[in-house]
Amino acid sequence: MEHVAIIDGQRHTVDAIQPVPGLRVYKHPHRDYGIGTYPVCLGHHEGRRIARTECTADAIDAARDLAEMADWTRSETEIQAAPGLAEKVADYLAGHNAIWAGGYR
């Protein structure tokens, strides 16, 4: 599926998959695969990135786990207003092979 990702304030159309409702996984348009590059993004369906991972499998696993924390089909505004969600997401990502991308904080 096509996904419009917002990266560094710019809109980019990328190919994506949706492993769970509301969350998309796609390759960052300006990062190549390689050790420590974290080129795969996990993002909200409205475009905001949540995390970067080293591979698609890690992003899919993160999406499945984050799906248990919130209804990601809601708007970004509703999700940002959820008490404690940003901290839960950041704590989860810190313990997994992912880099917090600054979304929902």
Placement of each model-derived feature along the sequence:
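Negatively charged, low-complexity tracts enriched in Asp/Glu with abundant Ser/Thr
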Residues: 1-20
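Short aromatic-glycine-(Arg/Gly/Cys) micro-motifs in beta-strand/loop hairpins
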Residues: 32-48
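Non-catalytic tandem-repeat scaffold regions and their flanking low-complexity/translocation tails
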Residues: 24, 60, 71-75, 79-82, ...
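Short, isolated positions in well-ordered beta-strands
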Residues: 12-14, 25, 47-50
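Short intrinsically disordered terminal tails
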Residues: 1-3, 97-105
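Charged, amphipathic alpha-helical segments
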Residues: 18-28
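A short, exposed loop/beta-hairpin motif centered on an aromatic-Gly-Thr core
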Residues: 45-58
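A short, sequence-level motif marking secondary-structure junctions
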Residues: 17-19, 55-60
